[in-house]
Amino acid sequence: MSWQAYVDDHLMCDIEGHEGHRLTAAAIVGHDGSVWAQSATFPQFKPEEMNGIMTDFNEPGHLAPTGLHLGGTKYMVIQGEAGAVIRGKKGSGGITIKKTGQALVFGIYEEPVAPGQCNMVVERLGDYLLEQGL
């Protein structure tokens, strides 16, 4: 399966039990900041934004004072899982980022999608990739 198929079929799909509800944008990005696959709506990010995200995975709490920035959008960092998941909130939407051995899985959402639904979609794929050694 191509990386694009993972984004299209496992991240940008309808959320279980909520037909028509789906993430706003999603991507799989290597630890080095190279995009493996992304939805057409995923924001163009700056290298320093990706560096900040990677630093927060290695040093949990790094982004808390400044917020998480992606594509020029600032998210308030909320509870995640140190070294494994970063979650952010902005207005009625937010972001979930799951770290795997080689990549970061991104999901961005807006209402009516709930934070927990985004977490479920992103973390399920991230856990699967971890199980595959990726």
From Swiss-Prot:
Chain positions of motif Involved in PIP2 interaction: 84-100
**Modification after translation:** Phosphorylated by MAP kinases.
Matches recorded under SMART domains: PROF
Q: Where in the cell is it found?
A: Cytoplasm, Cytoskeleton
Pfam families xrefs? Profilin (PF00235)
Its primary localisation, in coarse terms, equals cytoplasm
Q: Which CDD domains match?
A: PROF (cd00148)
Residue pairs linked by disulfide bridges in the UniProt entry = 13-118
What top-level branch of life does the organism fall under?
Answer: Eukaryota
Q: Record keywords: Phosphoprotein included?
A: yes
> Sorted alphabetically, which InterPro entries does this protein's record hold?
PFN, PFN_euk, PFN_sf, Profilin_CS
Under the heading PANTHER family, the entry gives: PROFILIN, PROFILIN-5
Other facts = The variability of the residues taking part of IgE-binding epitopes might be responsible of the difference in cross-reactivity among olive pollen cultivars, and between distantly related pollen species, leading to a variable range of allergy reactions among atopic patients.
Q: How does it assemble?
A: Occurs in many kinds of cells as a complex with monomeric actin in a 1:1 ratio.
Describe the family membership recorded for this protein in Swiss-Prot or TrEMBL: Belongs to the profilin family.
Q: What is the recorded name of this protein?
A: Profilin-3
Q: Tell me the organism's taxonomic lineage.
A: Eukaryota, Viridiplantae, Streptophyta, Embryophyta, Tracheophyta
